[in-house]
Amino acid sequence: MEQEQDTPWTQSTEHINIQKKGSGQQTQRLGRPNSTQLMDHYLRIMSQADMHKQTVSWKQWLSLKNPTQGFLKTRALKRWKSFNKQGWTN
């Protein structure tokens, strides 16, 4: 089998997997992660991103459920200005 040349991508995807056996002294170096490892990593990252999105939307929802006075004032002014721009044509 022909060996691939190292490119910046393959160099960056190389990793070291340390497995402790018996005396805990053996280390095994793996070349590139296999597709299962890449998929696990991808799913882990995406679930972290999803958790962040949920947290942000939850905070926004909470601010709507229990808004501060400043937030209400700003929101009311924005609505009033947009209403005045439309005029009484509606």
From Swiss-Prot:
| Self-association state and partner proteins as the record states | Oligomer. Interacts with human SLC25A6/ANT3 and VDAC1. Interacts with host MAVS.
The record's family statement is: Belongs to the influenza viruses PB1-F2 family.
| Name the record gives this protein | Protein PB1-F2
Designated gene of the protein:
PB1
Q: What does this protein do?
A: Plays an important role in promoting lung pathology in both primary viral infection and secondary bacterial infection. Promotes alteration of mitochondrial morphology, dissipation of mitochondrial membrane potential, and cell death. Alternatively, inhibits the production of interferon in the infected cell at the level of host mitochondrial antiviral signaling MAVS. Its level of expression differs greatly depending on which cell type is infected, in a manner that is independent of the levels of expression of other viral proteins. Monocytic cells are more affected than epithelial cells.
Which InterPro entries does the annotation name?
A: Flu_proapoptotic_PB1-F2
Entry's Gene Ontology cellular component terms:
host cell cytosol; host cell mitochondrial inner membrane; host cell nucleus; membrane
Compartment(s) of residence:
Host mitochondrion inner membrane; Host nucleus; Host cytoplasm, Host cytosol
